Amino acid sequence: MDKFVGKRLDGRYEIEEIVGVGGMSVVYKAHDEIDDRTVAVKILKEELLQNEEFRRFKNESKAIAVMDHPNIVKVYDVGFGDRVQYIVEEYIDGITLKEYIERQGVLPWKDALYFTTQILRALQHAHDKGIVHRDIKPQNIMLLQDGTIKVTDFGIARFARSEQRTVTDKAIGSVHYISPEQAKGEAT
């Protein structure tokens, strides 16, 4: 049994179940007792609390917090305590674009165009706010039942207008989707 399921986080978020596990965090479905709504609570994995990579988790909350777009998941709250760090987001009742493609096989061109248009509008909004996602892939795109797309997981996003450039000896991104420049660890 997970240590958060069945517990209340910060006296407000009643954690109901795990809905996803990523490299940096575990995502839970929860009930916000104050605003009386279902939310997603993304909790940083305990082993990463003191890790330098934790900076990515903070980047995600900062990146999403400045955006307000119907095709980008909304952030409602963040918490950065010593023992638990989390982001509270809009709960997306849907499936990933990857799951959808696996079920459907080849997408009809009209669906592909409709989804791509929404994704591009979301990315344009992010770019207008000075944010580069850097990990766009079908697993980071959610599809609602009504066909609405939501771009998620800004964990390795960076602010494009910042003075600091990302140049390290590490590749940033998902191996099947990163550009050759990212794979070489060059500036992005």
Descriptions of predicted regions:
Residues 78:
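Activation-segment/catalytic-loop signature of the eukaryotic protein kinase fold
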Residues 115-116:
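Activation segment signature within eukaryotic-like protein kinase domains
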Residues 31-38:
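Conserved N-lobe loop of protein kinases adjacent to the ATP-binding glycine-rich P-loop
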Residues 16-22, 27:
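Protein kinase glycine-rich loop
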Residues 45-66:
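AlphaC helix of the eukaryotic protein kinase fold
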Residues 82-96, 100:
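Conserved short submotifs of the Hanks-type protein kinase catalytic core
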Residues 120-131:
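Protein kinase catalytic-loop region centered on the HRD/HxD motif
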